Amino acid sequence: MPKKESMQQKSLNAPDEVRVFDRGKLELASLGGVTFGRATFQPGWKWSESVKPLVKTEWCEAPHVQYHVSGRLRVVMYDGTEMEFGPGDVGVIPPKHDAWVVGDEPVTIIDISGMKHYAKPKAARPAKKKAKAAKRAKPRAKKRRR
């Protein structure tokens, strides 16, 4: 019999985890296999100055699917493409970007994609599963029927 799915609820006002970094904070709640993040960035916050020293990557490697609650955020991709997001905007931001707060108002974002490992030192993140991917690439032997 299939397992019955049930509704779930959590609040970002009582997060599972809080990560604090220079001029910013991330509140996380996970349920149903999804990690929701509420990021708050203060005026003067810039990813390459506030988070890069923690994660030790050249660009933000997290993909984001975001709803922008307040403030203005400018994002530049590694190829030089730029876009600015403000209240009410939704956005998809691929890996390899930098971002910063525009103006004097804090930025608040709800992210449903890229916050699970955001602002987490590289050593604290799980290793990529190369062995598992290689195993999947091998052809499977056919089972013999008896």
For each feature predicted by the language model, list its residue ranges.
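A short, N-terminal "cap"/entry segment at the start of jelly-roll beta-barrel domains
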Residues: 1-40, 48, 124, 142-146
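Double-stranded beta-helix
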Residues: 2-14, 100-135
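Structural motif
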Residues: 35, 72-74, 96-98, 106
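Conserved hydrophobic/aromatic positions in well-ordered beta-strands
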Residues: 37-39, 66, 100, 110
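Conserved short histidine dyad/triad with adjacent acidic residue
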Residues: 38-60
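Short, conserved beta-strand element in jelly-roll/cupin
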Residues: 41, 57-75
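Short acidic-glycine-tyrosine-enriched beta hairpin
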Residues: 77-96
